[in-house]
From Swiss-Prot:
Binds 1 zinc ion per subunit. Signal peptide: none annotated. InterPro entries: aa-tRNA-synth_I_cd-bd, aa-tRNA-synth_I_codon-bd_sub2, aa-tRNA-synth_I_CS, aa_tRNA-synth_I_cd-bd_sf, Glu-tRNA-ligase_bac/mito, Glu/Gln-tRNA-synth, Glu/Gln-tRNA-synth_Ib_cat-dom, GluQ/Sye. A motif ('KMSKS' region) lies at residues 237-241. It catalyses: tRNA(Glu) + L-glutamate + ATP = L-glutamyl-tRNA(Glu) + AMP + diphosphate. GO terms for biological process: glutamyl-tRNA aminoacylation. This is Glutamate--tRNA ligase. GO terms for cellular component: cytosol. HAMAP family: Glu_tRNA_synth_type1 (MF_00022). The lineage of its organism: Bacteria, Pseudomonadati, Pseudomonadota, Gammaproteobacteria, Enterobacterales. It comes from Shigella flexneri. GO terms for molecular function: ATP binding; glutamate-tRNA ligase activity; tRNA binding; zinc ion binding. PANTHER family: GLUTAMATE--TRNA LIGASE, GLUTAMATE--TRNA LIGASE, MITOCHONDRIAL-RELATED. A motif ('HIGH' region) lies at residues 9-19. Its EC number is 6.1.1.17.
Length: 471
């Protein structure tokens, strides 16, 4: 049997981390078994579904490189198929037309709730022989079995049982002729030959209804696995108040897709004590029986740690392709300065996100208007004039410009003036970067370049001279 899974989001908003984890688990399960992964857009909610949301879902899936083998399928393009199946069910007696008014249904609901009963349709039209005009408004309901129970072996939670007496005859076609969500899902899973349905635990109550419809259609019943919810670090359901929840927001905040995938796969699944997983290792080791049935707590600090790891562990050339987007957001012209891959090597240890890296690299490519106020006050004092003049001249004398030669020039200046490296290094750092912090000074000056470094040292000397004149 060929394994076939699906990810079926509703395009009413962005792709959130809970949906992304479900997609990842479905994708991994299919890949682990050499199967296929289907993308299906469940857009039957015509009022809330938007093209922008569909695009956001696609963007998130593509950014995470969760490629699909079939689709995307759109439920709104399959209405003829759904209605054909409903008409067949009406002929076979597994569905029936219901003419009950909204007023009657509301009164029934209030009466049941007053008695402490679970609100449900009472089946009035199920056995009715009243004649109705062809154009009289009605819905179509599924004739749910009235005896026995539905039992399914959830691959994460174990056996789950529902009594059919708890399930009412759900509506499968509305008065406007449109099929409902629970019915469309069933026909889609049947037609697309889905073998394993991996989805959130909020769908558990839909499962017995969907199984009963599948059995009525004499269709195969897939295997179900319901993943627990994701909570914030306060134990409450993850929401916007906990920070970013959109996959693309994490991209915007400077996270690598490898970091988010690694974090999400471990958010409810484990393989021994291993924390870092390549995509290939995820595929190799992933099993549903290792997925926890308990809710998981989202920990941003852990994700940040993983992101920092991947910034330094992945090839700099690859990280640079993701950094490029953030550089563009900052409007930095990188034509005059180090290659982005070299920048990743320079700033990788200091920066935990690519956004932070982009926001802290401008001085490598563009001249700054002024020195940081605290740094210039502390380090661009008259006492720094001589060290800057000497190191400038030594840098100017270098004919070959590797970082080690820059280091020798700085060290030689300190030796000549008989001062500590800090007396030379700190004024030089402020002079060439405009700030009091940077990566190692020799590689920083090397990356900025000889001409630009000397120009900036001269600018710092002019600043010191002005400061001396004002005293």
């Amino acid at each position: 049997m060929k394994i076939k899974t699906r990810f079926a989001p509703s395009p009413t908003g962005y792709l959130h981390v809970g949906g992304a984890r479900t997609a990842l688990y479905s994708w991994l399960f299919a890949r682990n078994h050499g199967g296929e992964f289907v993308l299906r857009i469940e857009d039957t909610d015509l009022e809330r579904s938007t093209p922008e949301a569909i695009e956001a879902i696609m963007d998130g899936m593509n950014w995470l490189s969760l490629e699909w083998d079939e689709g995307p399928y759109y439920q709104t393009k399959r209405f003829d198929r759904y209605n054909a199946v409903i008409d067949q069910m009406l002929e076979e007696g597994t569905a029936y037309k219901c003419y009950c008014s909204k007023e009657r249904l509301e009164a029934l609901r209030e009466e049941q709730m007053a008695k402490g009963e679970k609100p449900r349709y009472d089946g009035r039209c199920r056995h009715s022989h009243e004649h109705h005009a062809d154009d009289e408004p009605c819905v179509v309901r599924f004739a749910n079995p009235q005896e026995g129970s539905v039992v399914f072996d959830d691959q994460i939670r174990g056996p789950i049982e529902f009594s059919n007496q708890e399930l009412d005859d759900l509506i499968i076609r509305r008065t406007d002729g449109s099929p409902t969500y629970n019915f469309c899902v069933v026909v889609d899973d049947w037609d697309m030959e889905i073998t394993h349905v991996i989805r959130g635990e909020d769908h558990i109550n839909n499962t017995p209804r969907q199984i009963n419809i599948l059995k009525a259609l004499k269709a195969p019943v897939p295997v179900y696995a319901h993943v627990s919810m994701i909570n914030g670090d306060d134990g409450k359901k993850l929401s916007k108040r906990h920070g970013a929840v959109s996959v693309m927001q994490y991209r915007d905040d400077g996270y690598l897709p490898e970091a988010l995938l690694n974090y999400l796969v471990r958010l409810g699944w484990s393989h021994g004590d291993q924390e870092i997983f390549t995509r290939e290792e995820m595929i190799k080791y992933f099993t549903l029986n290792a997925v926890s049935k308990s809710a998981s707590a989202f920990n941003t600090d852990k994700l940040l740690w993983l992101n920092h790891h991947y910034i330094n562990a992945l090839p700099p050339e690859y990280v640079a392709t993701h950094l490029q987007w953030h550089i563009e957001q900052e409007n930095i012209d990188t034509r005059n300065g180090p290659q982005l891959a070299d920048l990743v090597k320079l700033l990788g240890e200091r920066c935990k996100t690519l956004k932070e890296m982009a926001q802290s690299c401008r001085y490598f490519y563009e001249d700054f208007a002024e020195f940081d106020a605290d740094a210039r006050k502390k380090h661009l004092r008259p006492v720094a004039r001589q060290p800057l003049e000497v190191v400038r001249d030594k840098l100017a004398a270098i004919t070959d410009w590797p970082a080690e030669n820059v280091h020798h020039a700085i060290q030689a200046t300190a030796d000549e003036l008989e001062v500590g490296m800090g007396k030379v290094g700190m004024p030089l750092r402020v002079a060439v970067t405009g700030a009091g912090q940077s990566p190692a000074l020799d590689v920083t000056v090397h990356a900025i370049g000889k001409t630009r470094s000397i120009e900036r040292i001269n600018k710092a000397l002019d600043f010191i001279a002005e400061r001396e004149n004002q005293q």
